[in-house]
Amino acid sequence: MTGQGLAHLDRRRVLALIAATASTFRAASAQGSRQVLRVSAPYNPSTLDPHTGGAGSDHVVLYPMFDTLVGFDPETLQPKPGLLTAWKYADPLSLVLDIRPGITFHDGEALDAEAVRFNLERVRADARSVIKTELATVAAVEATGPLQVTLRLKQPDSALPLILADRAGMMVSPKAIKQFGPDSDRNPVGTGPMKFVSWAANESVKLTRFENYWQKGQTQLDAIEFTIITDVVTGVRSVVSGQNNFIYQLRPTQQQALSRSKEMHVGVAQSLYSVVMYFNYGRPPLDDVRVRMAINHAIDREAFNKAIMMGLGAPAHTVLPASHWACNKDVATYYKYDVERAKALLAEAGHKDGIDLEFSGYSDQRSVQTQEVVIAMLRKANIRAKFTTGALAVVTTEYFTNKKGDGTLAAWTGRPDPSVSFALMFNKESFLNAGKVEISPELTQAVLDSRKYTELDKRKAALDRAQILVAENALYLPLVFQPEIFGHAPQVKGYKSNLLGKPRFDGVSISS
């Protein structure tokens, strides 16, 4: 079935369910006085430990439980105070962090300098940490006061404040880590407005209000309950019927259909989220740059955007969208759609009769449809792709940990600081570099160079170089930037999207 045919089918299903469930929605939405945000979530978390999880989709569940040391502005991603009241570079190799007083973890333990030091050392050195590269420039973490920590650096690193606005800055109770050990991923204890109740894998994650939260009045919600619904049409039905009252990662077809419904508010916002294919270039045949280049030339990104995003997205040529201050727009010229060029590159690489490749991907309907479009485009260039599908957590483990397959069709969800994207995707020791190969030492250096400066023009020059090196080496297949499309019941108030495209529920309330 073509992308256009899939779109029409999807739209018809959505319109039908609106008509069928509208009356049920009105009855269900009037029930209960507790403010419970019930979220239809498309993916089961890979883990509830922010330092050991490998899926960008985990953030939506992690944010309510784990505050970060540094916050960020939702529109600009510029850093702002969080668990830290302030931070400053005492000198180019010393970053001083001042911790907000009076904060406790959900288990009653105090957030102090020792707790922060413990967490940052865990990120840097724990065997289970998948984000070690984020703090690669840190030589030592020292508690230099009861509420002060100083990071001693190997070299200047201007990206650290925004690195601490992501997973590396999510603080976990040291007591809980010591108590639960490897089971801490199922027993999360943070400092956020919501504390953990239960996680039934592939079914639900339930959180309840943390009464001793340090930001009084920040949330009016009594609870957040995530129901794992991988089929997005079923997820829409759950919101229209009143079973849930919030859904994210809607398809563009559903946005068009639901925009005419009075039963749900639908919003669209641009984001850093991109659909990508990761390559294992540590093994044949993708260790040959010509094969990787051929795959890139075989994809018609404009047609892909129309088929999968109905034109609401933007063709992706690099990690950053064209509107981002650090985007190198020249990279868009590297891989124009050219089937004959793709075939020629394969022939040069010794595959004149084409090539068979084994990829993996998720098993939900949306992902399978995306895989079908990729298969059809690659076939025209004599690239015969076969996908093995499964749940997100399974696919993530099989490809990135167990090294199975030539590549995986997934996503890159972006990070507040652009340099982190390049480090996490392509660094030799990164979790996302399945082959654990350093194709380009110059790329590694360019990323490090981008962190030496605070001036944006100097940072951009280094990041421009990084993007060129990624393109020249065809280190992955960027496909399309996906807009954040969300929907919620009219009673849900105060939701604001962010540029990362990962929903946060700060300030959300539910009217009666």
Regions found by a protein language model. Name each.
Residues 314-348, 366-369:
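Structural transition elements
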Residues 73-74, 78, 165-219, 223, ...:
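Gly/Pro-rich hinge or "lid" segments in bacterial periplasmic/extracellular proteins
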Residues 211-257, 375, 384:
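Ligand-site clamp/hinge motif
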